[in-house]
């Protein structure tokens, strides 16, 4: 017997990612779009979310308030900004809703706030919802343990010209995975870009390089380079749909979970 679909709401419904999330919800029979939210004052308030996303009417009008749709969904999917995500997570904690957070760029204090909310609220938070990226993190752990102490490690990432944070949350997570596997502290060994006369490279460092150009959806490479050979582990996303589908998968999984702070590794059973 088929279970009831998971009712979701999507914040930032008119944005590029918001429209992709609406499209993904439309495509998946296990998901039911219950609400789509935009900021107050938007000219799109009242527009059908499905028509906005180009997938046909879904009988869900864009609204400017979570309070107005509190009875229409069980899980909020949030790809907005760190400040907005904190507000939305607080609302979910007060109203008995779970939340999937795909926002990046949180500072340490904001991460601590979300962790505190998870004591009473089921939360999946991941800097990248793509299944392939989460598999890549597992491969990086293996590569770091085998080669990390004997190679120079560089992380190169590229995104579209509109992305606001750098390095990307995915790139930072790559660094965290590698550093943890090697017993290093990323805050102490990360090197963000180079300029001028830098001297010989310190093998203990993990380098980060950032590209912002055109309409790149997301490209990430970790390089383990020695004299005479190197290994590169790369993930390239060609569509935001890969992130949206991962978010829907996370929502379906989270519907059965108790309060806590989870990541996509747990959603996918990779831990």
UniProtKB/Swiss-Prot annotation:
Keywords: Amino-acid biosynthesis, Cytoplasm, Diaminopimelate biosynthesis, Lysine biosynthesis, NAD, NADP, Oxidoreductase. The lineage of its organism: Bacteria, Pseudomonadati, Pseudomonadota, Gammaproteobacteria, Alteromonadales. Catalyzes the conversion of 4-hydroxy-tetrahydrodipicolinate (HTPA) to tetrahydrodipicolinate. CDD domains: DHDPR_N. NCBIfam families: dapB (TIGR00036). This is 4-hydroxy-tetrahydrodipicolinate reductase. Belongs to the DapB family. Pathway: Amino-acid biosynthesis; L-lysine biosynthesis via DAP pathway; (S)-tetrahydrodipicolinate from L-aspartate: step 4/4. HAMAP family: DapB. Its EC number is 1.17.1.8. The active site is at residues 159, 163. It catalyses: (S)-2,3,4,5-tetrahydrodipicolinate + NAD(+) + H2O = (2S,4S)-4-hydroxy-2,3,4,5-tetrahydrodipicolinate + NADH + H(+); (S)-2,3,4,5-tetrahydrodipicolinate + NADP(+) + H2O = (2S,4S)-4-hydroxy-2,3,4,5-tetrahydrodipicolinate + NADPH + H(+). InterPro entries: DapB_C, DapB_N, DapB_N_CS, DHDPR_bac, NAD(P)-bd_dom_sf. NADP(+) binds at residue 39. One of its GO terms (biological process) is diaminopimelate biosynthetic process. (S)-2,3,4,5-tetrahydrodipicolinate binds at residues 160, 169-170. It is found in: Cytoplasm. GO terms for molecular function: 4-hydroxy-tetrahydrodipicolinate reductase; NAD binding; NADP binding; oxidoreductase activity, acting on CH or CH2 groups, NAD or NADP as acceptor. It comes from Shewanella sediminis (strain HAW-EB3).
